């Protein structure tokens, strides 16, 4: 194990999929209740390196790199990255791990993917923890934007495929500056942590591991209607914990329609799930689980260790 290995890490995993492999890292007890950890857009499994050592170690935590991220294989040429394909990755991973029921811990984009898996396979999920992320992204009044996202996604992929440019080589300083400029919520320490897994050394510097076809998260996400959101929430069969950072994703939504859509979703979860839904606000920014993991660790630990059974929602 390298000197940069995360505290408590017990193994690196490589799970076979038709286009190559999904990489993951594991902590805790193999005999413990399983928890699948899902990272944010263009992040990787190392985003949980500082949080998981603070959680109960009698659980088994597996943090996967989504396809095209971290150490996971890129999708085959011509195959797009869509929300449904990321959801199917989860199904493949848990099948390889032989998990029949497990909990999900998802940050940002990982929470959206985990939420969609939760609603698609409700019988498989014991608990869902959303780290500064909505369960879904709802359609806003700006419907034209949705078409713009879809068009931009297609054009970007075609442009990348046509260019066939070799990977750009950077110094660590250059990559860190780029990363922090586009992610103001990241500290330098957290940025370096992500780059350790998100880059590969070559003779003249570092190259990014991520698939260049990945650009904007909006291009890969399916926006859903309020009716589908409410219907999906009614199908949930487990407890849900939503942790909101004071200066995080929800706070950054400037558009009134976006804020109103988020309020609708949270209110629907509160009224439908009742005691099955827990909403907690903590100090910090969108990456609080990395920069200040102590602010969320005890909340997540208590939620995971709660053993009361939930009635099935019919």
From Swiss-Prot:
Entry keywords, A to Z: Cytoplasm, Hydrolase, Peroxisome
Gene3D superfamilies, per database record: alpha/beta hydrolase
Record flagged with keyword S-adenosyl-L-methionine: no
Key word Hydrolase present: yes
Residue ranges of every copy of the AB hydrolase-1 domain listed in the record: 33-293
Localization in the cell: Cytoplasm, Perinuclear region; Peroxisome
GO molecular function, one term: hydrolase activity
Family: Belongs to the AB hydrolase superfamily.
More details: This gene may have been partially duplicated (see SERHL).
Name of the molecule in the record: Serine hydrolase-like protein 2
Protein source organism: Homo sapiens
């Amino acid at each position: 194990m390298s000197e940069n290995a995360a505290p408590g890490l017990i193994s690196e995993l490589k799970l076979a999929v038709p286009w190559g492999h999904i990489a993951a890292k594991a902590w805790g007890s193999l005999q413990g209740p399983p928890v699948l950890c899902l990272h944010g857009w263009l992040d990787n499994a190392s985003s949980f390196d500082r949080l998981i050592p603070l959680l109960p170690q009698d659980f088994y935590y597996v943090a996967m790199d989504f396809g095209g991220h971290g150490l996971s294989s890129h999708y085959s040429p011509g195959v797009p990255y869509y929300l449904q394909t990321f959801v199917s990755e989860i199904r493949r991973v848990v099948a390889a791990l032989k998990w029949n029921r497990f909990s999900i811990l998802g940050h940002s984009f990982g929470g959206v993917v985990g939420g969609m898996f939760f609603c698609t396979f409700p019988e498989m999920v014991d608990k869902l923890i959303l780290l500064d992320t909505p369960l879904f992204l709802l359609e806003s009044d700006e419907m034209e934007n949705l078409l713009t996202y879809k068009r931009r996604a297609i054009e970007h992929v075609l442009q990348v495929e046509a260019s066939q440019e070799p990977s750009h080589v950077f110094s660590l300083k250059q990559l860190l500056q780029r990363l922090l400029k586009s992610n103001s919520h990241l500290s330098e320490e957290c940025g370096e942590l992500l780059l350790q897994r998100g880059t590969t050394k070559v003779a003249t510097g570092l190259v990014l591991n991520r698939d260049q076809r990945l650009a904007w998260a909006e291009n890969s996400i399916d926006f859903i209607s309020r009716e589908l959101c409410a219907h999906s929430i009614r199908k949930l069969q487990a407890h849900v914990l939503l942790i909101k950072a004071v200066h995080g994703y929800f706070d950054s939504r400037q558009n009134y329609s976006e804020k109103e859509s988020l309020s609708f979703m949270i209110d629907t979860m509160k009224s439908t799930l009742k005691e099955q839904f827990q909403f907690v606000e903590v100090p910090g920014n969108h990456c609080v689980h990395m920069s200040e993991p102590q602010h969320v660790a005890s909340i997540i630990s208590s939620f995971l260790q709660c053993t009361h059974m939930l009635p099935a929602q019919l």
